[in-house]
């Protein structure tokens, strides 16, 4: 269902009602989807779990954090700006990074392109692990999930 500039779905994980939100904005405007949904459902930032890609992590690596800066990620920058805080948990999925020598558009092409070969396999596996990490955060808490998945 399209609401808040996002595809939304409500489901239950471990007995907890969960709103899934996939912004339909450009990445650098993700906060325009997250903040209205958070306001509507009266969700404090610490109850918002963001899953995003991260080019600073090797392909397939997960990193869970309970809060932090954007790390240069434009989607996270937008969410931080819209919520007015960095204090929300996130799961970062490593997608690796391109060789940028001589190509100023290499990073843009990398994150907007399609992964192939071993990187694609690693990221596919990481996405399955990220889904398990989401369940772990909801059912067991962030500290336990960080110990399991970091």
Across the structure, where does each feature detected by a protein language model lie?
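Hydrophobic alpha-helical segments within soluble ligand-binding/sensing domains
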Residues: 72-75
